[in-house]
Swiss-Prot record:
Keywords: Disulfide bond, Late protein, Membrane, Transmembrane, Transmembrane helix, Viral envelope protein, Virion. It is a single-pass membrane protein. InterPro entries: Virion_mem_poxvirus_L1. The keyword Membrane applies. The keyword Zinc does not apply. This is EFC-associated protein OPG053. Coiled coil: none annotated. The chain crosses the membrane at residues 176-196.
Length: 212
């Protein structure tokens, strides 16, 4: 696959911020953390799939960092959109990040499962990026069934919002997170991922990147 520019969405910005926060709080644990995928299916056009294990035993901290990252990213959206997305996900923007959210309560109801994710068939759904660009979809195992649930819920909402590359290219280069933050302040559009041209089933097992 030829080298292409990444098509930025709030999905990417959120997950990058969240992973950075997790890395800053990394504590050696005995948590078993692995992702087993028997089959990846979906509709893809110029998409890349990344599988990441990032484990920690403190589920409460995982959720706190998750909410912090979420609030940072959506704070640059119009207030109406911020509140709509937060309500859909189950996060009260009036609460402090460390508060137990509705999202966390709902996800913890499913936490009595093995922290090894065993997905026999993973349906990515639809993913499409413009010619010459690619969209990165990340699957992250935090080592907690509850936190994984929260992560998936947030990503499903944020993956619908993207940052136009033309705006990003006009800005001077700084730290990547600062650059993207300024780009979002300038303009953010909400779009539905569409114009899918092909359906396929992909076999994936224990890799790092999968390009389609």
């Amino acid at each position: 696959m030829a080298e292409t520019k990444e098509f930025k969405t709030l999905y990417n910005l959120f997950i990058d911020s969240y992973l950075q926060k997790l890395a800053q709080h990394s504590i050696p644990t005995n948590v078993t953390c692995a992702i087993h995928i028997g089959e990846v299916i979906g509709q893809f056009k110029n998409c890349a799939l990344r599988i990441t294990n990032k484990c920690m035993s403190n589920t409460r901290l995982s959720f706190t960092l998750m909410v912090e990252s979420f609030i940072e990213v959506i704070s640059l959206l119009p207030e109406k959109d911020r509140r709509a997305i937060a309500e859909e996900i189950g996060i009260d923007l009036n609460d402090v990040p460390s508060a137990v959210s509705k999202l966390e309560k709902n996800c913890n109801a499913y936490a009595e499962v093995n922290n090894i994710i065993d997905i026999q068939k993973l349906n990515i759904g639809e993913c499409s990026a413009p010619p010459g660009q690619h969209m990165l979809l990340q699957i992250v195992n935090t080592g907690s069934a509850g936190a994984n649930c929260g992560l998936q819920t947030i990503l499903k909402s944020l993956n619908k919002i993207y940052v136009p590359p033309i705006i990003e290219n006009r800005l001077p280069y700084y730290d990547p997170w600062f650059l993207v933050g300024v780009a979002i302040i300038l303009v953010i559009f909400t779009v539905a991922i569409c114009s899918i041209r092909r359906n396929l089933a992909l076999k994936y097992r224990y890799g790092t990147f999968l390009y389609v």
